[in-house]
């Protein structure tokens, strides 16, 4: 499996994580709209944009794994011990999220995403 390289703003390598240095917005439907700012391969800030998570902001440590061309698994744990695992498909522009909240409540959601900046 190819290793992931730190990426500048543009690359043609489909195994390089393209999100670093960019802000993305994912619409999970209903009142769940979230933005993710990827600072590096190990740091990201989450912004809740509407609904019950509006004004939520947290910077988390992330782990990024290349699954295949243009598809990456991104995992993190939030301060309240919520654990999130994304499969981010940059070819199809969709994120699949598996979330385990404190108390073992499990959610599986998905939605389209777009680069904001």
Please annotate each region the language model reported:
Residues 2-32:
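Tryptophan-anchored aromatic micro-motifs
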Residues 42-45, 71-72, 93-95:
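Hydrophobic residues embedded in beta-strands of well-ordered beta-sheets
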Residues 4-7, 75-117:
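Beta-sheet ligand-binding and adhesion/scaffold domains
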Residues 24-28, 46-49, 74-78, 97-100:
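Short beta-strand segments that buttress and anchor functional surface loops
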Residues 32-62, 102:
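N-terminal glycine/threonine-rich, aromatic-flanked beta-hairpin/loop signature
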Residues 52-88:
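Contiguous, well-ordered beta-strand patches that form the walls/edges
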Residues 38-42, 66-68, 91:
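Residue-level recognition of beta-strand termini and adjacent short loop/turns
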